[in-house]
Amino acid sequence: MKAISLVGPKKSGKTTLGIKLAQYFKKQGLTVSAAKFSHHDLNWQDTDTTRYAEICDTVAGLGPNETFIHWDGHRFLPDLLPLLTADVLIVEGGKELGFLPRILCLSGDLSDGIEWLHPELALGSYGERTLGPIPVCKTIEELGDLVLEKGFFLPGMDCETCGRPDCKGLAEDIVKGVATPEACLAMHNSITVDINGAPVGMKPFVEEIISASIREMLRTLKGYSPGKATLTLDV
């Protein structure tokens, strides 16, 4: 799954940009999911949410007291991935998320500074403004191609097995071009688990327990031989 977040101050055009991106990807025959963060409680009549729902295959909303797709309480975005099966995930808001890259929307009020935008995670900006060396995309086509080329999603486990203190550190290096998503050992190890097409990360300790248990059970089966095994399970 390719993923990108749209981050900027209020009235900076995040929703409008998200809608245009979704339309662009749909025209390419891709499935698209959208996740919208909100500082207030959610309801299906929310204008932005319904706009996304008219275009996207799946929509999630994450508010302070509830999570859209009617789960009570706040949930961690990676927990929703099995329900957001798509080729591309568009996240609006979530400025503190460090496990995916972002596009900066800078047309709004920046009087509070730029540190909260975490430009170190930015693949680019959209519009007429940018920050420092961050490339600016002036068309939806240019922006969409950038997302398809460089978008990614880490598990957000902060397990440190990649040699960095958290997923944000790896995400920064991926954005810089000095690492790739394959450096995430929680997602790329000897066992791969996905639910409804969405990969599930696991710490090495958990991976060792699961893989060792499965190997021992498979060895007892008639017809077993060493090699690469494929196991499909309804959960």
Label for each model-derived stretch:
Residues 156-172, 186:
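Local cysteine-cluster metal-coordination motifs and their immediate loop/turn environment
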Residues 67-110:
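Glycine-rich phosphate-binding loop used to anchor ATP phosphates in small-molecule kinases
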Residues 10:
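The conserved Walker
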Residues 20-72:
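N-terminal phosphate/diphosphate-binding loop that engages ATP/GTP or pyrophosphate donors
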Residues 6:
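Hydrophobic anchor at the beta1->P-loop junction of P-loop NTPases
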Residues 14:
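Conserved lysine of the Walker
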Residues 145-158:
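Immediate flanking context of iron-sulfur cluster ligation sites
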Residues 34-35, 88-91, 100-107, 111-131:
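Conserved beta-strand/loop subsegment of P-loop NTPase cores
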